[in-house]
Amino acid sequence: MATLFIADLHLQTEEPAIVAGFLRFLAVEARQADALYILGDLFEAWIGDDDPNPLHREIAAAIKAVVNVGVPCFFIHGNRDFLIGKRFARESGMILLPQEKVLDLYGRNVLIMHGDTLCTDDAGYQAFRAKVHNPWVQRLFLTLPLFIRRRIAARMRAGSKAANSSKSLDIMDVNAQTVVAEMEKHRVQWLVHGHTHRPAVHELSVNDQPAFRVVLGAWHHEGSMVKVTPDNVELIAFPL
């Protein structure tokens, strides 16, 4: 009896080892779970459900196979794949969740999210996020030809990489006050998120009680998952 959480796989054809590791994870660990939650940035980039990239179909089929054996799979959008829509959700069998969700896991109330909304010290990123999450901007982007969308996405990734190279690590991490405010708002003592690529279990105080923030790692040379059971919450790194 366990519920699994992963995030920040950044799947792309240029990283076949990570793709293969994820497919193995779906074939083994995921099938033994009560449920699988993917907390964003499953893909390195997403320019629309109509992108014919074969990798997308392969991943959709692999997730659907997990769903078909009775393991529900849920998805929260990340900052790289926020345009994943209903078509891909149908193909993969995933259930799309809002950007924040509270789960009752074996008696624990756990808040889950991608995590980028916690990085409120990075004003430039938050302004950019507000623009690209505007429904009108998204609709306009999705009407463009695929080759133009690819160019725009590549330019945005390059710009993001350049901008991040000049930012301090502290600015790109979560804001402690924002974390506490979110946990107090949702009345939880547990938070699980990704985005920062800094796997750790942080202890803090929320509502004058002990609380925990569990940060998933990105999938690079190893995989990262959070495993929640009736008795424990574990942050686990494993070879790909």
From Swiss-Prot:
Record Gene3D superfamilies: 3.60.21.10
Main location group: membrane
EC code(s) of this entry: 3.6.1.54
Gene Ontology CC annotation, any one: extrinsic component of plasma membrane
Residues that, per the record, bind Mn(2+) 1: 8, 10, 41, 197
Cofactor note: Binds 2 Mn(2+) ions per subunit in a binuclear metal center.
Top-level taxon: Bacteria
Record has tRNA-binding as a keyword: no
Membrane topology: Peripheral membrane protein
Pathway linked to the protein: Glycolipid biosynthesis; lipid IV(A) biosynthesis; lipid IV(A) from (3R)-3-hydroxytetradecanoyl-[acyl-carrier-protein] and UDP-N-acetyl-alpha-D-glucosamine: step 4/6
CDD domains, alphabetized: MPP_YbbF-LpxH (cd07398)
GO BP annotations listed: lipid A biosynthetic process
Residues the entry annotates as binding substrate: 79-80, 122, 160, 164, 167, 195
Residues bound to Mn(2+) 2: 41, 79, 114, 195
Any GO molecular function: UDP-2,3-diacylglucosamine hydrolase activity
Swiss-Prot/TrEMBL catalytic activity: UDP-2-N,3-O-bis[(3R)-3-hydroxytetradecanoyl]-alpha-D-glucosamine + H2O = 2-N,3-O-bis[(3R)-3-hydroxytetradecanoyl]-alpha-D-glucosaminyl 1-phosphate + UMP + 2 H(+)
Cofactor entry: Mn(2+)
Family classification: Belongs to the LpxH family.
PANTHER family with a match to the protein in the record: UDP-2,3-DIACYLGLUCOSAMINE HYDROLASE, UDP-2,3-DIACYLGLUCOSAMINE HYDROLASE-RELATED
HAMAP family, sorted: LpxH
Function: Hydrolyzes the pyrophosphate bond of UDP-2,3-diacylglucosamine to yield 2,3-diacylglucosamine 1-phosphate (lipid X) and UMP by catalyzing the attack of water at the alpha-P atom. Involved in the biosynthesis of lipid A, a phosphorylated glycolipid that anchors the lipopolysaccharide to the outer membrane of the cell.
NCBIfam families named among the record's database cross-references: lipid_A_lpxH (TIGR01854), PRK05340.1 (NF003743)
Name this protein carries in UniProt: UDP-2,3-diacylglucosamine hydrolase
Record gene name: lpxH
